[in-house]
Amino acid sequence: MNIEEVALKYALANAVKYGGKADVKAVMAKIMAEVPELRPRAREVKEVVEAVVARVNAMSLEEQRRLLEEKWPEALEEKRPEQKRPGIEALPDLPKVKGGVVVRFAPNPDFVLHLGSARPAILNYAYRLKYGGRFILRFEDTDPRTKRPLVTEEVNAYEAIREDLRWLGVSWDEEYIQSRRMEVYYDYAKRLLAMGAAYVDLCRPEEWRRLRNEGRACPHRSQSPEENLELWDKMLEGRFREGEAVVRIKTDLSHPDPSVRDWVAFRIIDTSKTPHPLVGDKYIVWPTYNFAVSIDDHLMGVTHVLRAQEHSVNTVKQSYVFKHFGWEQPVTIHFGRLKIEGATLSKSKLKALKVRYDDPTLPTLAGLRARGILPEAIWELILTVGIKPSDSTVALSNLFALNRKKIEPVANRYMYVADPVRLVFEADRELVAKVPYHPSFRERGERVYRLGPGRVEVFVQRQDVKEGAVVRLMELANVEIERVEGGVAYGRLHSLSLEEARKIGAPIIQWVVDPVEVRVVRPWAPGRKVEEVGLGEAVLRGVEVGAYAQFFRYGFVKKIGPDVFIYVHD
């Protein structure tokens, strides 16, 4: 067996999957798992792997993929079992699909994902599942000044986004981080400058805006490629300060949208003042969104781009880069804006709340996860809205309704009393209550409560007891409230049957005996929640953390700690 060939295969596969950089440990683990007979030679194998990984990492991503396709095309095939998702086949067909699609989800890691950003992630991945191909995760983080990536002691947005996608059930075939591809962008910038398709502009911003609005060229547009390349080198050397020089793509100065006219491809950002969390102050000349996206979509072989309608002008801007290089632009599908009634999706507003990103009051994916929303409910919501070009408005209650359908079968029923008062009455016989854990799944069993004969004491909710009224204690008996004194209600046994309660219109209320104190966290508004203390059945102590339950006449909850539940929805 040729160890070097085995190492090359897995190093190339690892590098292609993770943006061009193979990892020695990952390659070693793969080799030992796939070729166990090499385990006794681990030290020898590691030396070979280290040398091969170094050689592979020196290649461009395009070279890595080409070599892998030539020698081991099967290594590029998708091997993970693919989940069948209801609704995927109902999505409208994409145009110009040839065998499979290459799609991408490209978040800016200046914040974590929320319900709105789940839409492009799910839709792109859904088409990847529908047609086969590749799904790319690309972090677009080339603005360390105004859209600085969020990396703090509390949260690393890069990892948080990965975690959110895994929770959603979205897995990626390749991953890229744009801030680690700066040399690639520099290379293509030089090519455009040498072609005369771009130029270095030294105009003052206000002068440029005046010329642009008049549809006139700035003086630097006619510079020779040699002059532009010299100015480009000076930009890289730090000879210009912020705002003194930019690189512009030559477009159409008469374009009806002034923002399309010779848009900025590179600008200077003083990273000594605003260092990038991943690459520090290594670079001061940074590509703009539209330039980096154009280069990456081509080099990564993206075939279809699904994104929000607000990006339509960006598609126009990017078309000029594709035209200058003679590349085919990906098929682009723009879908309408998704508005969620009852949820704030603005990053700036969410940041201003100054609460943890996984706070259950927030519509972030981490917040929804903490609250008890299932990823399957989010999938169903997004696939129902689909990729229609018109704007859509969906109430947060729609998501709750979908989630309710999914947790209802697994959520056992329990009695819980908020704002409790003691109810005392005399029983002339033994009263027996059999409370099933789930009315639709009787095989799960029931709790049996035996009270009386004699004095009976239970706890009920304060608002349920009114003098002179008859109430039905669920599964137990009908009691007439005679008087209420302070925190105690006194009553008498009225009757036993449910039929009698219905006949006289007695409300059915919850009650607990020998209870445990239960705390319920209720999300109230973004950044605001209240904690309610009540009494619950003692069997709630046995509910596992993470399990769902339904409190009768209250709503669905999820256990998050000893005797602590979070309110999910009604």
Curated annotation (Swiss-Prot):
Catalyzed chemical reaction(s): tRNA(Glu) + L-glutamate + ATP = L-glutamyl-tRNA(Glu) + AMP + diphosphate
Subcellular location: Cytoplasm
Any Pfam family hit: tRNA-synt_1c
Top-rank EC class of the record's enzyme: ligase
GO terms (BP aspect): amide biosynthetic process; glutamyl-tRNA aminoacylation
GO molecular function, one term: glutamate-tRNA ligase activity
Motif ('HIGH' region): 107-117
UniProt-listed PANTHER family: GLUTAMATE--TRNA LIGASE, GLUTAMINE-TRNA LIGASE
Similarity comment: Belongs to the class-I aminoacyl-tRNA synthetase family. Glutamate--tRNA ligase type 2 subfamily.
Function: Catalyzes the attachment of glutamate to tRNA(Glu) in a two-step reaction: glutamate is first activated by ATP to form Glu-AMP and then transferred to the acceptor end of tRNA(Glu).
UniProt-recorded name of the protein: Glutamate--tRNA ligase
Species, as recorded: Pyrobaculum calidifontis (strain DSM 21063 / JCM 11548 / VA1)
